[in-house]
Amino acid sequence: MMINKEQDLNQLETNQEQSVEQNQTDEKRKPKPNFKRAKKYCRFCAIGQLRIDFIDDLEAIKRFLSPYAKINPRRITGNCNMHQRHVANALKRARYLALVPFIKD
């Protein structure tokens, strides 16, 4: 009976020592800096452009394409739903007219 109490006390002491060591390591850790991304906005809504046509400007087309010539999603481009659909249709039209490749070689 006496041995069990001593063992329990020893275990409690070791647990307390471990928790103190953990607290010390937690204090050494530096907090991550708060990082806020700039809110993405629809370029076309900002300038009030309703019709999207990329036939004249090939550099504007490449802004909405990935390195593998795929159409970038809304979360990357920042377009609203309506303008993203217009961009996708304009890019498909540009592909059909052979202004943009279907896939990157």
Swiss-Prot record:
Arranged from A to Z, the UniProt key words for this protein are:
Ribonucleoprotein, Ribosomal protein, RNA-binding, rRNA-binding
Tell me where the signal peptide lies: none
**Cited InterPro entries:** Ribosomal_bS18 (IPR001648), Ribosomal_bS18_CS (IPR018275), Ribosomal_bS18_sf (IPR036870)
GO molecular-function terms, A-Z = small ribosomal subunit rRNA binding; structural constituent of ribosome
What's one GO-annotated cellular component?
A: cytosolic small ribosomal subunit
Kindly indicate whether the keyword rRNA-binding belongs to this entry: yes
Cite the residue spans of the region called Disordered.
1-34
GO BP, one annotated term: translation
Entry keyword annotation includes Lipoprotein: no
Q: Where is the composition biased (Polar residues)?
A: 9-23
Q: How does it assemble?
A: Part of the 30S ribosomal subunit. Forms a tight heterodimer with protein bS6.
User: What family is this protein classified in?
Assistant: Belongs to the bacterial ribosomal protein bS18 family.
Function in brief: Binds as a heterodimer with protein bS6 to the central domain of the 16S rRNA, where it helps stabilize the platform of the 30S subunit.
**What's the protein name?**
Small ribosomal subunit protein bS18
Q: Which organism is it from?
A: Mycoplasma genitalium (strain ATCC 33530 / DSM 19775 / NCTC 10195 / G37)
